[in-house]
A protein has these predicted regions:
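Hydrophobic, well-structured mid-protein blocks that either form specific transmembrane helices
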Residues: 23-69
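Acidic, serine/threonine-rich low-complexity disordered tracts
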Residues: 1-29, 72-177
C-alpha cells in the first residue's frame, strides 16, 4: 500500500533441488487480519487466518523495517519487538542494538557496522530461549546493507556474508578499505 507502506500481499515460491514450497499472505489491515496459504511439494494447500497488530509483518518487511530505522536514534542495549507472520503462526522477533564496530567482511574489506542481536520467540508469548540469539551486521551508512549474519547451531555456527552490491541509493561511506 503506497499510502501506509504496509504489505498488502506477500508471496514466496521456493524451488531447491527436489523441494518446492509456495506461500501467499493476503493482508486486510482495516480488519486487522491476514489470510495465509501454503503448500509443500504436491501436498494439499493449507490455509489459516490470523489477527494482526501494528507491528505484524512478513520476514522481508521486517528486515526492511530494521534497515529503514534511523541509526542515529539507536542506543546501545535498546530493544525493539516486532511480530513476524509465518504460514501458520505469528512469532515475536526481538532485536537489540549491540553497538557500532569495525568488521572485516570476507572478500569485501573492512566496514563500519551496526551490530544487532536478534531472537525469535514463541508464538504463544514473548518467551525467548537463552542462547538462541543470532547476529546481524549492517553497514553504518544510509544504505544499511546486510553485510554478515551469524547464527549458532548445535555444533558450530552458520555464517552468511555479502558477496557484492550494485545500484546503491546512497554512497557507501561505511567502507574503510
Amino acid at each position: 500500500d503506497t499510502a501506509t507502506l504496509r504489505t498488502v500481499r506477500f508471496t514466496s515460491d521456493i524451488h531447491e533441488g527436489g523441494y518446492t514450497f509456495r506461500s501467499r499472505f493476503d493482508y486486510d489491515w482495516p480488519a486487522r487480519r491476514v489470510a495465509t496459504r501454503w503448500q509443500r511439494r504436491t501436498l494439499p494447500e493449507n490455509r489459516k487466518e490470523m489477527a494482526l497488530t501494528d507491528v505484524s509483518m512478513d520476514a522481508v518487511s521486517l528486515f526492511f523495517n530494521m534497515r529503514s530505522a534511523d541509526a542515529a536514534s539507536f542506543r546501545v542495549g535498546e530493544q525493539r519487538v516486532l511480530q513476524m507472520v509465518l504460514e501458520d503462526t505469528i512469532r515475536h522477533l526481538r532485536y537489540r542494538f549491540e553497538g557500532r564496530e569495525v568488521k572485516k567482511i570476507r572478500n569485501m574489506g573492512k566496514f563500519n557496522t551496526l551490530k544487532f542481536a536478534c531472537q525469535i520467540g514463541t508464538s504463544e508469548s514473548f518467551s525467548f530461549t537463552d542462547g538462541s540469539e543470532f547476529f546481524i551486521w549492517l553497514s553504518d551508512d544510509e544504505n544499511k546493507i546486510p553485510l554478515h549474519l551469524e547464527s549458532p547451531i548445535r555444533v558450530g555456527s552458520v555464517n552468511a556474508y555479502i558477496t557484492g552490491y550494485k545500484g546503491l541509493k546512497y554512497p557507501l561511506t561505511s567502507k574503510i578499505r
